């Protein structure tokens, strides 16, 4: 089967989607249900570009050996979740230098005050007070370059990245106002039915791979038995008699368990409420633990299949980077001409 040319790809009718994940920690079941599973569903209807954003990862100090391992782990997880290199462009950010090249130019069209207002910079600065570096401050501009260099139409974003996407739109519109229609202005993609998985011990906050309390987190690569134990210890509430019902305000812990079970089994929340009517919270926890541990076991089998084949992983990275570079260079050439750089002889 012949690969489409760059011009054929760019002229396709499918909207272009870009998204990525950092290889800086273990991906969680929250990442899977909220993002990766949505990415898989989008592959047939969108022109999908999925990146492993290793350059973003080093805004926080990384062990080099561990970063290389986690980059390959993340790629294998992408594949295990169902992201298909025949349908999507999959690559590692540092393999495509056009991201960093465009990022520098966009820095010159981004204001200090805009970056100062980014809440994620404030949060990360507080957590990493010993290493408040320029890259951490400038992170949203590299994210903007990641998006704009592919003429992205839609970006799947969570609440924590919504402010960054708004900045990306502002930068694109500002640049276009000066130089003409150079960039597509990206829109947020709001997935339907994507569960927002919350922390098991603190169900009013989102599950995060960087959470210091590991009892809050279910990693995709952790021992399924460990995951089951965490679920059985998850916070519920003290309602008497116990009622298994979905109520984010009054019953965040129970609602989170129902979201998890719905996400894994495909059942609706009303179906699950009916199924557990009159039952104790322990019954719900056992059902969630069994479903999640079963899902993790199957996912990890697929992960190890891909992770143990580094020849295949290297091939996918090389082919993905080649496709991404060709597409990114088209945009970069337009930008270079617009700002007045002399074409490379």
UniProtKB/Swiss-Prot annotation:
L-tryptophan binds at residue 146. It catalyses: tRNA(Trp) + L-tryptophan + ATP = L-tryptophyl-tRNA(Trp) + AMP + diphosphate + H(+). GO terms for biological process: tryptophanyl-tRNA aminoacylation. A motif ('KMSKS' region) lies at residues 206-210. Its main location: cytoplasm. It comes from the Bacteria. Gene3D superfamilies: HUPs, Tyrosyl-Transfer RNA Synthetase. A motif ('HIGH' region) lies at residues 23-31. Keywords: Aminoacyl-tRNA synthetase, ATP-binding, Cytoplasm, Ligase, Nucleotide-binding, Protein biosynthesis. Homodimer. Belongs to the class-I aminoacyl-tRNA synthetase family. This is Tryptophan--tRNA ligase. It comes from Photorhabdus laumondii subsp. laumondii (strain DSM 15139 / CIP 105565 / TT01). The lineage of its organism: Bacteria, Pseudomonadati, Pseudomonadota, Gammaproteobacteria, Enterobacterales.
């Amino acid at each position: 089967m012949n690969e489409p040319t760059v011009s054929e790809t760019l002229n396709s009718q499918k909207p272009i989607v870009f998204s990525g994940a950092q290889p800086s920690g273990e991906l969680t079941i929250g990442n899977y249900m909220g993002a990766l599973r949505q990415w898989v569903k989008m592959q047939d209807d969108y022109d999908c570009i999925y990146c492993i954003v290793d350059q973003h990862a080093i805004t926080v100090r990384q062990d080099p050996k561990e970063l290389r391992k986690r980059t390959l782990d993340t790629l294998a997880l992408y594949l295990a979740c169902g992201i298909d290199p025949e349908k999507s462009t999959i690559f590692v950010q540092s393999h495509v230098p056009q991201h960093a090249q465009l990022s520098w130019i966009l820095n010159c069209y981004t204001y200090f005050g805009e970056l100062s207002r980014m809440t994620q910079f404030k949060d990360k600065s507080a957590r990493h007070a010993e290493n408040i570096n320029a890259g951490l401050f400038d992170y949203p501009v590299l994210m903007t370059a990641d998006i704009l260099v592919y003429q992205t139409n839609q970006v799947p974003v969570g609440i924590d990245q919504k402010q960054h996407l708004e900045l990306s739109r502002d930068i694109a519109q500002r640049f276009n106002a000066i130089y003409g229609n150079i960039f597509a202005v990206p829109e947020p993609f709001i997935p339907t039915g994507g569960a927002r998985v919350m922390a098991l011990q603190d169900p009013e906050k989102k599950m995060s791979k960087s959470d210091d309390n590991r009892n809050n987190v279910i990693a995709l690569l952790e021992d399924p038995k460990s995951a089951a134990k965490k679920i059985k210890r998850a916070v519920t509430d003290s309602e008497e008699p116990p009622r298994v019902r979905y109520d984010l305000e009054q019953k965040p812990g129970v609602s989170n368990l129902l979201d998890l079970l719905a996400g894994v089994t495909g059942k609706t929340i009303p179906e699950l409420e009916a199924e557990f009517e009159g039952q104790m919270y322990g019954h719900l926890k056992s059902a969630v633990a069994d479903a999640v541990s079963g899902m993790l076991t199957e996912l990890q089998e697929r992960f190890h299949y891909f992770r143990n084949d580094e020849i295949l992983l290297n091939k996918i990275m090389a082919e993905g980077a080649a496709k991404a570079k060709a597409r990114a260079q088209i945009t970069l050439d337009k930008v270079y001409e617009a700002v007045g750089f002399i074409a490379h002889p």
